[in-house]
Amino acid sequence: MSGHGAPTTDATTLDASTLRVAVVAASWHTTIMDGLLDGARRALADARAGHVVQVRVPGSFELPVAASRLAGDVDAVVALGVVVRGGTPHFDYVCHAATSGLTEVSVRTGTPVGFGLLTCDTEEQGLDRAGLEGSHEDKGYEAAHAALSTALTLGY
């Protein structure tokens, strides 16, 4: 949901008071992750989410397994992580595995997974999307809004 043409995301229009939500967050790139988590928490509060559990995992590669484990116990999952391109193919492998894994969790379980995994060429790109002061986007908020909105659409 990035860039020109993105839908407006205002979680105050949602009533998630009956939803159980898991937020799964990676630990790398602390400043960016703090912004993503703050954004997700704001969206959950704006939508009055009923029950929220937060889990931290080491990195973005671990997001799918944690999301999979939690998906059976909640109505929506918000997955947050940051991968910044380095000088090796590791970036491509982690991004592909995490993206495919989170998609698989959502399709296999029927539990919406809000996709808040930033795949950035530079740390500055991540900071610009983290919902921090001066950021142009708030991907944590957007990911939480997407998970809640989809869960409500599906009748959770």
UniProtKB/Swiss-Prot annotation:
<feature type="binding site">
    <location>
        <position position="129"/>
    </location>
    <ligand>
        <name>(2S)-2-hydroxy-3-oxobutyl phosphate</name>
    </ligand>
</feature>
<feature type="binding site">
    <location>
        <position position="115"/>
    </location>
    <ligand>
        <name>5-amino-6-(D-ribitylamino)uracil</name>
    </ligand>
</feature>
<dbReference type="InterPro" id="IPR034964">
    <property type="entry name" value="LS"/>
</dbReference>
<dbReference type="GO" id="GO:0009349">
    <property type="term" value="C:riboflavin synthase complex"/>
</dbReference>
<comment type="similarity">
    <text>Belongs to the DMRL synthase family.</text>
</comment>
<protein>
    <recommendedName>
        <fullName>6,7-dimethyl-8-ribityllumazine synthase</fullName>
        <ecNumber>2.5.1.78</ecNumber>
    </recommendedName>
</protein>
<feature type="binding site">
    <location>
        <begin position="60"/>
        <end position="62"/>
    </location>
    <ligand>
        <name>5-amino-6-(D-ribitylamino)uracil</name>
    </ligand>
</feature>
<dbReference type="GO" id="GO:0000906">
    <property type="term" value="F:6,7-dimethyl-8-ribityllumazine synthase activity"/>
</dbReference>
<dbReference type="InterPro" id="IPR002180">
    <property type="entry name" value="LS/RS"/>
</dbReference>
<keyword id="KW-0686">Riboflavin biosynthesis</keyword>
<comment type="pathway">
    <text>Cofactor biosynthesis; riboflavin biosynthesis; riboflavin from 2-hydroxy-3-oxobutyl phosphate and 5-amino-6-(D-ribitylamino)uracil: step 1/2.</text>
</comment>
<dbReference type="Pfam" id="PF00885">
    <property type="entry name" value="DMRL_synthase"/>
</dbReference>
<feature type="binding site">
    <location>
        <begin position="87"/>
        <end position="88"/>
    </location>
    <ligand>
        <name>(2S)-2-hydroxy-3-oxobutyl phosphate</name>
    </ligand>
</feature>
<keyword id="KW-0808">Transferase</keyword>
<feature type="active site" description="Proton donor">
    <location>
        <position position="90"/>
    </location>
</feature>
<dbReference type="GO" id="GO:0009231">
    <property type="term" value="P:riboflavin biosynthetic process"/>
</dbReference>
<comment type="function">
    <text>Catalyzes the formation of 6,7-dimethyl-8-ribityllumazine by condensation of 5-amino-6-(D-ribitylamino)uracil with 3,4-dihydroxy-2-butanone 4-phosphate. This is the penultimate step in the biosynthesis of riboflavin.</text>
</comment>
<dbReference type="InterPro" id="IPR036467">
    <property type="entry name" value="LS/RS_sf"/>
</dbReference>
<feature type="binding site">
    <location>
        <position position="28"/>
    </location>
    <ligand>
        <name>5-amino-6-(D-ribitylamino)uracil</name>
    </ligand>
</feature>
<feature type="binding site">
    <location>
        <begin position="82"/>
        <end position="84"/>
    </location>
    <ligand>
        <name>5-amino-6-(D-ribitylamino)uracil</name>
    </ligand>
</feature>
<dbReference type="GO" id="GO:0005829">
    <property type="term" value="C:cytosol"/>
</dbReference>
